[in-house]
Amino acid sequence: MKNEMVKKEFVDLGLSVKWANMNMGAKSSIENGLYLAWNEVNVDDEGRLPSENEMIELIEKCNWEWVNKDGKTGYNVRSRINGNEIFLPAAGLICGEKAYFVGEMGYYLTNTMKESPIGACELIMSPKSHGMYLAGLYKRSVRLVK
């Protein structure tokens, strides 16, 4: 069923934290959800932003496959530890009021700040690669952890 409503859950990938099965503000695992700047993320018992190290752990301990899932492109991220998986949609980013790179790239915030004019660390993903970079001043996707 396309875009089926699912309950937000935290998936055990065998890592140090559990990862939400959908982006913050989404109603299904393939929806882009909210786009937020680092200082706009306000969470409580729902979870929290992952740290840079937790995002690196996700990169290093999971297999990443670029897929088209019900018309949405992104990565299926499958744990090498227990086989569980999450989908990270290529939601692009927001600059001002305009969306860029939707369906082509994904940008996911972390809670790790760096001493630079740019600020927070983020995961950037495209069909050819994925890795950690310094975030600019744009609004990005948020995937919570517990």
Ranges and model annotations:
Residues 5-7, 12, 17-48, 52-146:
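C-terminal, surface-exposed recognition/capping segments
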